[in-house]
Amino acid sequence: MGVDAFRIDTVKHVSRVMFNRHFIPAFKAAGGENFYMFGEVCTRVNEVWNHGVAPLSTPFYTWKERSEYSADDSVAVHEGYEYEKNMGPNNQPISDNHALTGAYGNDYHKPDYSQASGLNVIDFPMHWNFSNASQAYGMRGQDYNYNDATWNVVYVDSHDYGPNMDNRYPGDTNAWAENMTYMWTFRGIPCLYYGSEIRFKAGADADKGPSAPLEKTGRAYYGDNIEGTVTATDFGEYTNASGAVKATLENPLPQHLRDLNKIRRAIPALQKGQYSNTGCDGSMAFKRRYVDDEVDSFVLVTIGGDATFTNLPAGTYVDVITGDSKTIAEGGSIITSGCSGAGNARIYVNTSLKGCEIAGKIAKYSSFLK
């Protein structure tokens, strides 16, 4: 069957020297140069640099070594840790691989991966700040510390933790809708813990070990909620749902996810684009772009409120939430309207660019996208 990617546990407890020297080259040799790997660098602090110790921090593992160490692994581990600890957070490498450039923040550039370790990470600092989407969004100012933050895996809660807590995320349906809209449109790869789409075990202890039955924790068995039948007919489309899975699918958040998945799939810039806030006036407003030989995907996004976007590339912009269309000249502006309510968004795609055939409205199931 094969393997699409590796999720590597407890990365923080293994020296980066060992990853760069042994593990990553071996995995790449087996899986190919583009084989995706991401690791859990569990830091449990709100800041990017874990108590000011660079080699125990999340971004650190996305970089190659920058000094030579002993051929003896046991010695090299100590040398590497001491060298980088003494260098400190302020002397770590930085990158603009995540960022659109140019005078107006509209220009995509080829990422420079010459110093990338080949290991990506769960965005633990963002996870720890995910009390709400706005607070998580505030972490973007630290993205330059990662080799390329667009490869970060982003989640709200997991089998171990919720944001800044040992519980599954306790937020209500509106909070989850906003979180999902943010994760599916901003940089990074969204990851959803099982059951969060129906707020399964919301607020429960994530893990009590032998101190409590699993049923009382966030690791409880979820299978009862997906019993029944359903026929998948296309991506995000299904018929003939019955039993418990029918009730699960009819919840507002799964319907919200149907639309978000379709939207993300239709717009390459949302999947893997660089981003900028330049010329984006809104509480959570940004633009993203991705360019390769076949596509030039440029999109404007505002979440939970209206925004004004200025100094934009010329073209016809179509909002996949409402179907609204606006045509502007080079350097023109777009002002959104009607974007209020938790989880709501306006997502305008420049359909005049190469490979961006968006006919109109995509959203049709979510009660939040309107």
Stretches found by the model and what they are:
Residues G355:
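Short acidic/polar inter-strand loop motif in beta-rich domains
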Residues R187-I189:
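Short glycine-/polar-rich loops that comprise or flank the Walker A/P-loop
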Residues A149-P170:
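Active-site clefts of carbohydrate-active enzymes
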Residues D4-D148, N152, G171-T173, N179-T185, ...:
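Active-site-proximal helices and loops of the catalytic beta/alpha 8
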